[in-house]
Curated annotation (Swiss-Prot):
It is found in: Cell inner membrane. It is a multi-pass membrane protein. Keywords: Cell inner membrane, Cell membrane, Membrane, Transmembrane, Transmembrane helix. Its main location: membrane. InterPro entries: UPF0060 (IPR003844). GO terms for cellular component: plasma membrane. Belongs to the UPF0060 family. The chain crosses the membrane at residues 7-27, 33-53, 63-83, 90-110. This is UPF0060 membrane protein Aave_2845. It comes from the Bacteria.
């Protein structure tokens, strides 16, 4: 159950980061309201706070988080951008998630 909680925390963290970057992107690239910067900043603050909730060392958290970020970003590609990930996207996500699992759940202290 710890693994599921860890993965879900990484996924929520990734959503906060992606939303925090996407909202300024809308303002800069699609001429949307500058008011989008306010929730964008809030999302990035939430992202930073969520990273502190992970119990591992910061560098290990960032490394493992990267794998989940890739998978969540592909979900965003499909849900928000309307582009369905292809088999290569999915293969890449599987590799990064495998790396995340090794980093996050390896038995530390074992030889």
């Amino acid at each position: 159950m710890v693994e599921l909680k860890t993965f879900l925390l990484y996924a929520v963290t990734a959503l906060a980061e992606i939303a925090g970057c996407y909202l300024p992107w809308l303002w800069l690239r699609q001429d949307r309201s500058a008011w989008l910067l306010v929730p964008g900043a809030a999302c990035l603050a939430l992202f930073a706070w969520l990273l502190t909730l992970h119990p591992a060392a910061a560098g290990r958290v960032y490394a493992a988080y990267g794998g989940v970020y890739v998978a969540v970003a592909l979900g965003w590609l499909w849900a928000v951008d309307g582009i369905r990930p292809d088999r290569w996207d999915l293969a890449g996500a599987a590799v990064t998630l495998a790396g995340m699992a090794i980093i996050a759940f390896a038995p530390r202290g074992a030889a």
